Amino acid sequence: MVNVELERDQKVGRWKVIRKLAEGGFGAVYHAIDEKTNDDCAIKIEACDQNSVLKMEAFVLMQLRGRSPHACAFLGCGRQDGKLNYLVMTLVGRSLSDLHRSRPDRKFSHATVARLAIQCIEALEDLHNIGFIHRDVKPGNLAIGRTNMDRRVVYILDFGLARRYSSDPSNKDLRPARQGVGFRGTVRYASINVHDGLEQGRHDDLLSLMYVLVEFRASRLPWNDVDDDDEVARMKRKIPVAQLLKDVDAEYSTRYARLAKMQFKDKPD
């Protein structure tokens, strides 16, 4: 793979790199400055010699433009020097994963979890309304704003694993559900359907969010320290719902049970 490491003050289009923010299997994210407007922004990069995830992410961000207060603004994309693809978007603040870890007891209050739940559900609904499923809902892909204007806004990030489930704006014309689908997502937060190789639907995004909210309130999930994927799946099937949801509000049990019964074609209410 081509090395696409960027240096401080390096130019990518009209954007100048300030520092690296994060790095993962698909590439890296940098804090940068728009030299035209002097605004802070984020640049995601990937090597040109790998299957592009930024192409999907750029497309989703463009589709969400003006349709969701929970999506970063798309600022540009392109290819540089034949070595890297890049995507530029607004810069957000700390991830919910970082905020959760920074708590002394690793717990958010009931009120905080409720506020986060509302915004996360809104963010997923906005995504679903344009015909896409996220497929990797987790605390690291959710963040708050970084300015006084948006520091209470939750943003949903990283659409590299997103998949179109409908080409119809009304979401009535669904793509056929596949069988034996490869695992997509993060083991800790994936729904049982994902472990079983089923096509992910809108309800699977929300089931992942349920696991996230439980972790926020309880500090951890029962399988947090389990490394074996099959054992995690077994624990998810075996644990009583009442035990899993004992630290969150009672209404979560009803919602979890309803989501667990849904199929790919079903629209969560």
PLM features per residue range, with description:
Residues D34-K55:
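ATP-binding glycine-rich loop module of kinase domains
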Residues G82-S95:
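Conserved short submotifs of the Hanks-type protein kinase catalytic core
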Residues A28:
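Conserved N-lobe ATP-binding subsite of Hanks-type protein kinase domains
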Residues A143-R184:
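Activation segment/activation loop of eukaryotic-type protein kinase catalytic domains
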Residues S97-F108:
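AlphaC helix of the protein kinase catalytic domain
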Residues L116-A117:
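Activation segment signature within eukaryotic-like protein kinase domains
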Residues A73-N85:
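Short beta-strand micro-motifs within the conserved protein kinase catalytic domain, predominantly
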Residues H128-R146:
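Catalytic-loop of the protein kinase fold
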